[in-house]
């Protein structure tokens, strides 16, 4: 890009508050932050204005170092300043610096900074505290009490006993679950071990009856299997005859006619 004319460069050297913006045809005033075209007539008219005359006379010897260490040059933009108390960027002009330092946000942050210095506590800007609190609230809302699932643990001995007691013995007659103690003779005095009068008189008849019942059950089971087999074969034959296609399709059509 071509450089401005020599008369424009000479005029800019006479007014240090006017700075030429790189890669543009514009000039920025550091006192007001105003941008104007890089042409000599516009620059002369701007410098003759009342606002520029007032600011240039009052801020000709403005000391930016007086606001350090809270306001320092910005590392991102060399034409701006950065406030460490409010984490804000400020235009490098006396008017903007004074407006920021006299504002409520800066004064509140400066008061908190001084209190932290007295107590020996590190100062944290308010915006960082707000972000940190918001992050903690989100983590607490994600992990509500009572919703966290614990790790699996093996059951204790009491729980195992309770599970073992949960049998289905109450659904069956108690005679099936009577236990005979070891080491005792068979002819014990317990009432369960004595035979009734009918069992004592006809033990052989009861054995023959149980044998006959087992034989009848076996024969009935065989008959049931044969009957089911016959029904299955008849069903398969009907299914095959229904879904069987004729070999000659033309003959089938003739029969249909």
Swiss-Prot record:
Basic and acidic residues compositional bias, start-end: 177-189, 199-219
What is any one of the record's Gene Ontology cellular component terms? nuclear speck
Q: Where is the composition biased (Basic residues)?
A: 220-247
Q: Which UniProt keywords apply?
A: Phosphoprotein
Region entry Disordered, spans: 134-257
Q: Does the keyword ATP-binding apply?
A: no
Q: Which domain of life is it from?
A: Eukaryota
Q: Which family does it belong to?
A: Belongs to the SURF2 family.
Query: Mind telling me what this protein is named?
Result: Surfeit locus protein 2
Q: Which organism is it from?
A: Mus musculus
């Amino acid at each position: 890009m071509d450089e401005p004319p020599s008369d424009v460069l000479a005029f800019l050297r006479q007014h240090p508050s006017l700075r030429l913006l790189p890669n543009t045809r514009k000039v920025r005033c550091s006192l007001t932050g105003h941008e104007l075209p890089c042409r000599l007539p516009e620059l002369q008219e701007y410098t003759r204005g009342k606002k520029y005359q007032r600011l240039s006379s009052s801020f000709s010897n403005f000391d930016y170092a007086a606001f350090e260490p809270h306001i320092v040059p910005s590392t991102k933009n060399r034409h701006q300043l950065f406030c460490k108390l409010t984490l804000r960027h400020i235009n490098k002009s006396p008017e903007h610096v004074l407006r920021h330092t006299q504002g409520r946000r800066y004064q509140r942050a400066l008061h908190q900074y001084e209190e932290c210095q007295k107590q020996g506590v590190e100062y944290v800007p308010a915006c960082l505290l707000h972000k940190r609190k918001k992050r903690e609230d989100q983590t607490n809302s994600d992990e509500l009490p009572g919703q966290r699932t614990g790790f699996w643990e093996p059951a204790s001995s009491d729980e195992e006993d309770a599970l073992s007691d949960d049998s289905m013995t109450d659904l069956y007659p108690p005679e099936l679950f009577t236990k005979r103690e070891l080491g005792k003779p068979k002819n014990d005095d317990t009432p369960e071990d004595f035979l009734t009068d009918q069992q004592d008189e006809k033990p052989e008849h009861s054995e023959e009856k149980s044998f006959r019942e087992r034989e009848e059950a076996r024969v009935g089971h065989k008959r049931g299997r044969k009957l089911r087999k016959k029904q299955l074969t008849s069903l398969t034959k009907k299914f095959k005859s229904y879904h069987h296609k004729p070999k000659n399709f033309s003959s089938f059509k003739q029969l249909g006619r």
